[in-house]
């Protein structure tokens, strides 16, 4: 377990453990939900022995484990005696907030015997009291939005790179084949001069320098690119602040062969210069070899 970070996520039902674990997954943690406490030492040992060593583990342990949960304090003592280092993240919220969340989700509290939500909350607070006292970090999510909780988790458990971890994909496509279903933003570049109507350029693609020169030489292109890069200089930090981890930019022309390819590659170059993580993919390039794919 040397060098392996073991994070135990626990806390009140409805306090945001599910959202926290999703964020931890985005940060590269290997996450397991509702693992019986007695299995924690063996699980950690197996992770340390894997060929591709798992360096960060997050385990959700809470009262859903029923009678198994009663062993959690003893298990934590055993981990400490064995020299296995761990951290405990405890999430909680006010009764008022938890009641509202349970009503919105229309789910019963797991410890409520009479159907009264507050009864279940108070019973859970009592059951978790000792575990809360061992927590390395307690987060009260009463006034947190999901995005704010994700940002807090990233600040606590992500490195500097993780805090600005946004995986960007720029996809060129042809409108004749449909807009990519996973697109977050769609940019229509069909207003730019079309190389398809130049006989010497028609058989080429946006990967070829003559096509790139043709597209970039147009005054309209120059003005558009200036606006486009300013747009993303503004948008990307906002997405990161909001906790977004993936962003798909779809850039389309008629057939996905010329203009969209040029612009997707250009955008990739610009964002890499700004130290963003971006992959460029040309979805429809080479899809139609009949000469109609423009």
UniProtKB/Swiss-Prot annotation:
It comes from the Bacteria. Keywords: ATP-binding, GTP-binding, Nucleotide-binding. The keyword GTP-binding applies. GO terms for molecular function: ATP binding; GTP binding. It holds the Pfam family PapZ_C. The keyword GTP-binding applies. GTP binds at residues 62-65. InterPro entries: P-loop_NTPase, RapZ-like, RapZ-like_N, RapZ_C. ATP binds at residues 11-18. Signal peptide: none annotated. NCBIfam families: PRK05416.1. Belongs to the RapZ-like family. Displays ATPase and GTPase activities. This is Nucleotide-binding protein Daud_0300. The lineage of its organism: Bacteria, Bacillati, Bacillota, Clostridia, Thermoanaerobacterales.
